[in-house]
Swiss-Prot record:
One of its GO terms (molecular function) is oxidoreductase activity, acting on the aldehyde or oxo group of donors, iron-sulfur protein as acceptor. Keywords: Oxidoreductase. The keyword Ubl conjugation does not apply. It comes from Moorella thermoacetica (strain ATCC 39073 / JCM 9320). It is an enzyme of class 1 (oxidoreductase). This is Oxalate oxidoreductase subunit alpha. It catalyses: oxidized 2[4Fe-4S]-[ferredoxin] + oxalate = reduced 2[4Fe-4S]-[ferredoxin] + 2 CO2. InterPro entries: OxalOxredalpha, PFOR_II, Pyruvate:ferred/Flavod_OxRd, Pyrv_Fd/Flavodoxin_OxRdtase_N, THDP-binding, Transketo_C/PFOR_II.
Amino acid sequence: MGKVRNISGCVAVAHGVRLADVDVICSYPIRPYTGIMSELARMVADGELDAEFVHGEGEHAQLSVVYGASAAGARVFTGSSGVGVTYAMEVYSPISGERLPVQMAIADRTLDPPGDFGEEHTDAECCRDQGWIQGWASTPQEALDNTLIYYRVGEDQRVLLPQYACLDGYFVSHILGPVDIPDEAQVKEFLPPYKNHHVLDPRKPQIIGPQIEPAMGPPLQYQRYQAVKGVHKVLEEACDEFARIFGRKYDPYLDEYLTDDAEVIIFGQGAHMETAKAVARRLRNLGEKVGVARLRTFRPFPTEQIKERLSKFKAIGVLDVSANFGISCSGGVLLSELRAALYDYGDKVKTVGFVAGLGGEVVTHDEFYRMFQKLKEIAKTGKVEQTSYWIPFEL
């Protein structure tokens, strides 16, 4: 065990980056992620981290800087929130297409309008199909640990893909919690120095990202598809190795809570699921068979694991902390993903969506209680009268 400190999610991520011994960091301020860069700037200034700290003139520039640095063989880090995430959209696909294991922390924030700076998953979910590994931490400890795990997976020669290490703005980024900061020797055992054999080298000139003939594109896209498809195996290995070295065991895909004999569960990702667990625990004490399944890996989506582990429940409520206008079922991205994964099971598993927590609002105990009551009603009657509910307006 390392040193346990009471720190925020932002500071925890910064310690993860320090322990990863990154070479290049590029920053641009936007709350709530800014605290990560503030702490990293202090670490560099105080000599705790030997890294090149670059200030971008915007998020597009941030991603462009780490794109080039990674292509030159550096281990790199950047981050953003909200509209900053979408401003850099042009650069995400080139980074994954060039198979550069850039890591980007996203401390979620709602998009404009109305200019709300509260937490939502909408910003990060906009980027979900760019060929990056993506998942959410629900505590400061998990935010630090995911930083290390994602570098390990993304830099594996079987993968070579960038990663969005997501954490809920404010609910994780700013709230303090106990964090075991690992010893550097342990981290070096888990995360060896980055070695990419295909880097820019003036002694061996090459070109990156050129214009090509249309017929040359599909094979490259297929290679990227195969790389994303292969992430799960490497992620499983990394989580096993992490548990061996650090003593903290993470399921690669799902954090299940009180699900062994549950009849209904709430499925979602991020910090609000910790509140869902508290409500499930209370209802269990009253004799109700309820549980929670928190998704740890959003991309690549663990379809087979979802089928295997969640098809046994009578009803599943899906919490989407995002605004997805015009989407199928009037819910969110997670509801669509889950329904697609469980399509083969037809009406055996009833699903219903809950859109809540928009704009950084707290999803309260009472709201989760109402969700569980709706799920119990669906399990009993076998009828889904409405495919999705916006909380608190419709339930």
